[in-house]
């Protein structure tokens, strides 16, 4: 199976949109749904809430979709979404989550309350377009994630990591689980003792062959594959 560099990941996304005529909301819904299924496979529902940290881009959109589906699966998601966008897609995703009774807040939770109130953290802050360093407005939540003892599930890229080189310093988060989308990125080779899943079951065979992705086979109707 091929691990993608940043430009390859961007190019594949562009081909999905332009050559194969997928819409952003189509792929986001499929990606977020697969993330919810991975979390349901790896972590049983608990009384504690799931803190889902969403960034301003498509990675954050995946998190908003996952929150909605997790609520339908009897989990208790709580969304931290500090930097909003005026794009209709993201406004709709937020509205859908809130309409289902999910709290979506701009208030950064403090470390102590996170440890007391939550049982799991989903990191949907930055995707494969990210280039360090982390912007100042996201430093508070990154500090919470770096210090937390709770398991962290990262969507596609552990936030703060270089997409190709992985963690840049010893303070970067180390997720307990990574959900790679479409295909793993090079940074996934730097995971330490983490569960690794592949989600996003939407890659056309012709596109897979063009980039020599050699994706693993999905079992039956599953939306994910466990890679380790």
From Swiss-Prot:
<feature type="binding site">
    <location>
        <position position="59"/>
    </location>
    <ligand>
        <name>K(+)</name>
    </ligand>
</feature>
<dbReference type="GO" id="GO:0052856">
    <property type="term" value="F:NAD(P)HX epimerase activity"/>
</dbReference>
<dbReference type="GO" id="GO:0046872">
    <property type="term" value="F:metal ion binding"/>
</dbReference>
<comment type="similarity">
    <text>Belongs to the NnrE/AIBP family.</text>
</comment>
<dbReference type="GO" id="GO:0005739">
    <property type="term" value="C:mitochondrion"/>
</dbReference>
<dbReference type="GO" id="GO:0000166">
    <property type="term" value="F:nucleotide binding"/>
</dbReference>
<dbReference type="Pfam" id="PF03853">
    <property type="entry name" value="YjeF_N"/>
</dbReference>
<dbReference type="InterPro" id="IPR036652">
    <property type="entry name" value="YjeF_N_dom_sf"/>
</dbReference>
<feature type="binding site">
    <location>
        <position position="159"/>
    </location>
    <ligand>
        <name>K(+)</name>
    </ligand>
</feature>
<feature type="binding site">
    <location>
        <position position="123"/>
    </location>
    <ligand>
        <name>K(+)</name>
    </ligand>
</feature>
<keyword id="KW-0413">Isomerase</keyword>
<feature type="binding site">
    <location>
        <begin position="58"/>
        <end position="62"/>
    </location>
    <ligand>
        <name>(6S)-NADPHX</name>
    </ligand>
</feature>
<feature type="binding site">
    <location>
        <position position="156"/>
    </location>
    <ligand>
        <name>(6S)-NADPHX</name>
    </ligand>
</feature>
<dbReference type="InterPro" id="IPR032976">
    <property type="entry name" value="YJEFN_prot_NAXE-like"/>
</dbReference>
<protein>
    <recommendedName>
        <fullName>NAD(P)H-hydrate epimerase</fullName>
        <ecNumber>5.1.99.6</ecNumber>
    </recommendedName>
</protein>
<comment type="function">
    <text>Catalyzes the epimerization of the S- and R-forms of NAD(P)HX, a damaged form of NAD(P)H that is a result of enzymatic or heat-dependent hydration. This is a prerequisite for the S-specific NAD(P)H-hydrate dehydratase to allow the repair of both epimers of NAD(P)HX.</text>
</comment>
<feature type="binding site">
    <location>
        <begin position="127"/>
        <end position="133"/>
    </location>
    <ligand>
        <name>(6S)-NADPHX</name>
    </ligand>
</feature>
<keyword id="KW-0630">Potassium</keyword>
<keyword id="KW-0479">Metal-binding</keyword>
<feature type="domain" description="YjeF N-terminal">
    <location>
        <begin position="9"/>
        <end position="215"/>
    </location>
</feature>
<keyword id="KW-0547">Nucleotide-binding</keyword>
<dbReference type="InterPro" id="IPR004443">
    <property type="entry name" value="YjeF_N_dom"/>
</dbReference>
<keyword id="KW-0520">NAD</keyword>
<keyword id="KW-0521">NADP</keyword>
